[in-house]
Amino acid sequence: MENLKETMRDVLENNILSYWLTKVKDEENGGFYGRVDGNDQVHPEAEKGAVMNARILWAFSAAYRVLKKPEYLEAATRAKDYVHDYFLDREYGGIYWSVDYQGNPLDTKKQTYAIGFAIYGFSEYARATGDKEALDIAISLYHDIEKHAFDAKNNGYIEALTREWNPIADMRLSDKDENGSRTMNTHLHIIEPYTNLYRVWKTPELEKSIRNLLDIFTDKLLNTETYHLDLFFNDEWEGKRNIESYGHDIEASWLLHETALVLGDKVLLHKIERIIRRIADAADEGLRPDGSMVYEHWKDGDKYDLQRQWWVQCENIIGHIDLYQYFRTEENLLVAISCWNYVAKHLLDAKNGEWHWAILEDGTVNKEDDKAGFWKCPYHNSRMCLELIERDY
């Protein structure tokens, strides 16, 4: 496994993070550029997204925590300062969804998903450095979510609200999503930062929130017929249950496992491990003979989205390494290695750095979507490298 760990460190440092340090830093307006397109062209006046900037903060904080290189701390601090100065809403709490290239608020809605990623980034910075201000911001954002976005009546987290935390008509994260008031994706990216915050701020209040989120996954989001996680719901948790998202399934399998491990409750861990193994089995329906994992299955009409998106491969690799590490199942190690071989051959851009967005159904590289941008960040692939470097498997 040492060879795999060495490969991951090389990819992390010389293919991913180096790209962000040399290509994406915005020296004129601060922080990082909002977009570098699929042909590596910088768009200096592109809007800057909260999710992208919070993920940059997380990635460089985590890289510094593990590798202790000063340039990673410098980049993490740059991202922290930018989110602090331009995205935090000092009047109403939470963070803005986007700012323009000069840092002026653009879309001021409160997307719970984005606030979750800000918690993830600030808590990781605190974890890596011991910085009290970063921890205080993460805690404050946690309280913002619990105060404004948690629906106690229906037990779930509201997808989005206005800047002032009032109801909003269009709650979608992106044009690709259904306009549901409850989504699996947002709940996944709340339990993920809450778990990370718990590592540095172990309080009964936060533990209660995390345990409740696990219950929401097992009682509301999990389709107990298929063991896929369903994606879109209304306030009362009614949903079409018509899409199977393999990448989200395998990502959830290891993130929920991580949550149970961090909580340290053996009874709960045993319960969650049974479930996450079945979720991972369901996700494996997306595996293909070339080692990759395809994107989605739409049960209406039995159609498949066969593109191989970069992030799905990352989560596929972590998820199967997690299964191998804890349950010693050799076939899961082989799945992870096979998927990595696919990534190295098709998605990783060895010439220009970073990874392509996807390989399309016809086998060509997707260069229409970004190398760095609103939804393309050094998060999934950096995390994959760091997980494989840090884990004992």
Regions found by a protein language model. Give the residues of each.
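Glycan-recognition and catalytic cores of secretory/periplasmic carbohydrate-active enzymes
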Residues: 1-393
